[in-house]
Swiss-Prot record:
It comes from Bradyrhizobium sp. (strain ORS 278). Homodimer. Part of the ribosomal stalk of the 50S ribosomal subunit. Forms a multimeric L10(L12)X complex, where L10 forms an elongated spine to which 2 to 4 L12 dimers bind in a sequential fashion. Binds GTP-bound translation factors. The lineage of its organism: Bacteria, Pseudomonadati, Pseudomonadota, Alphaproteobacteria, Hyphomicrobiales. This is Large ribosomal subunit protein bL12. One of its GO terms (biological process) is translation. Signal peptide: none annotated. The gene is rplL.
Length: 125
């Protein structure tokens, strides 16, 4: 039982990028695909529903790096996320890290613009 708890603790400490890489490695090892379940469910919606499903509606704003103006980026991260100073500083120094998840395209572009104006390098996923 202690071994299972250690596994849970180890998995909980992974970053989003590390978790995605782990998922890819497990898919290869076990010969499965996480996307297969989605592909099986999609045909039931019909051909007309397939086109809108391809357009991504939720985005994750990822801080790739803080750039030269780390203090400005920390201030902007605090304003966007509502995090405290220490949490925002840890997020910025731990880049690449997601700043905001599950936002629409318009909000994601707005956040990206704010962070880039502060000097950060940002990706939308």
């Amino acid at each position: 039982m202690a071994d299972l708890q250690k596994i849970v603790d180890d998995l909980s400490s992974l970053t989003v990028l590390e978790a995605a890489e782990l998922a890819k490695l497990l898919e290869e090892k076990w010969g499965v695909s996480a996307a297969a379940a989605v592909a099986v469910a999609a045909p039931g919606g019909g051909g007309a529903a397939a086109a809108p499903a391809e357009e991504k509606t939720e985005f994750t704003v990822v801080l790739a790096s803080a750039g030269d103006k780390k203090i400005e980026v920390i201030k902007e991260v605090r304003a966007i996320t509502g995090l405290g100073l220490k949490e925002a500083k840890d997020l910025v120094e731990g880049a690449p890290k997601p700043v905001k998840e599950g936002v629409n395209k318009e909000e994601a572009e707005k956040i990206k613009g704010q962070l880039e104006k502060a000097g950060a390098k940002v990706e939308l996923k």
